UniProtKB/Swiss-Prot annotation:
Synthesized as a Golgi membrane-associated protein, and the proteolytic removal of the N-terminal hydrophobic domain leads to the formation of a mature cytosolic enzyme. The lineage of its organism: Eukaryota, Metazoa, Chordata, Craniata, Vertebrata. GO terms for cellular component: Golgi membrane; mitochondrion; perinuclear region of cytoplasm. One of its GO terms (biological process) is prostaglandin biosynthetic process. CDD domains: GST_C_mPGES2 (cd03197), GST_N_mPGES2 (cd03040). It is an enzyme of class 5 (isomerase). The gene is PTGES2. It comes from Macaca fascicularis. Glutathione binds at residues 148, 164-165. This is Prostaglandin E synthase 2. Homodimer. May interact with CEBPB. Interacts with EXOSC10. It is found in: Golgi apparatus membrane. Isomerase that catalyzes the conversion of PGH2 into the more stable prostaglandin E2 (PGE2) (in vitro). The biological function and the GSH-dependent property of PTGES2 is still under debate. In vivo, PTGES2 could form a complex with GSH and heme and would not participate in PGE2 synthesis but would catalyze the degradation of prostaglandin E2 H2 (PGH2) to 12(S)-hydroxy-5(Z),8(E),10(E)-heptadecatrienoic acid (HHT) and malondialdehyde (MDA). The chain crosses the membrane at residues 58-74.
Amino acid sequence: MAPATRVVRALWTGGCALAWRLGGRPQPLLPTQSRAGFAGAAGGQGPVAAARKGSPRLLGAAALALGGALGLYHTARWHLHAQDLHAERSAVQLSLSSRLQLTLYQYKTCPFCSKVRAFLDFHALPYQVVEVNPVLRAEIKFSSYRKVPILVAQEGESSQQLNDSSVIISALKTYLVSGQPLEEIITYYPAMKAVNDQGKEVTEFGNKYWLMLNEKEAQQVYSGKEARTEEMKWRQWADDWLVHLISPNVYRTPTEALASFDYIVREGKFGAVEGAVAKYMGAAAMYLISKRLKSRHRLQDNVREDLYEAADKWVAAVGKDRPFMGGQKPNLADLAVYGVLRVMEGLDAFDDLMQHTHIQPWYLRVERAITEASPAH
């Protein structure tokens, strides 16, 4: 297949895998793998709701119901096991972060990858970065899960693959607070297949915004139940709404689309021919796709207005009495929103956002907090 054809095919079928993983068609669903993602600590198949003939809506509802039951099962199992874990822990532990060797497979300009980097940097977790070629994706040929980010965590003799940005963050935060083995933690976030209302197969992960902590551990992280609920709500908002405003804004005009792909090519891992093709053909394709996304998500004629409204809604939720939603330091919602917005830096959409909303002071505070905490990696 010619390089030009491969690039165009990646642009269309991969959509936002090449850019901000938001354009074009949804990523094709790939089989759940053993020991990779959340198929179970023993390496067996994870819980799967198989697609069957019939109503897509009913299939989706049935799969989600099964997922809820599985989530309750895993949560209950965790509650029983947590007491034993707590009793076994030494009063003086080795630094948990030093026991992990982390490798992040990413596209630098992907907002989901940016979320994970923001989390890792703020929590001073050293990690290696492998930039994935968005056309060939040879760097992740070891994985049947073909989206990024993928995080491989080596803990002693145990190696775990974590998929989905929100699951990666929740699992690692649980690990840092509780000290539970990562191999055990990832079983609390089971992968589930379902069919959505459009008849497309999708993979979801149970409990992905929830930290698996006992009551004492939760009190170390949250000031109360309301703070925990608030964090979960806004983490999901970042994934379900904010992230979908990026592509329509950065590809809003032909000029902006070209500038965006110039940045993607410079920051990404492209060959010379692939980069040249991606810059011009990718910009043209994503400009057209951005119009479809505008319609799909029912955005205003001027998509900037939706971006501005989202930013000001977030600022209002943080409020005037605390520097971050997490209080005196960023919580997981702060890091998620920051990570999504950061991918627009250097583009007109980002400059307009800073100029026309009240988000800049908060954004700079998070940036400073991450910079001060971040190790060299």
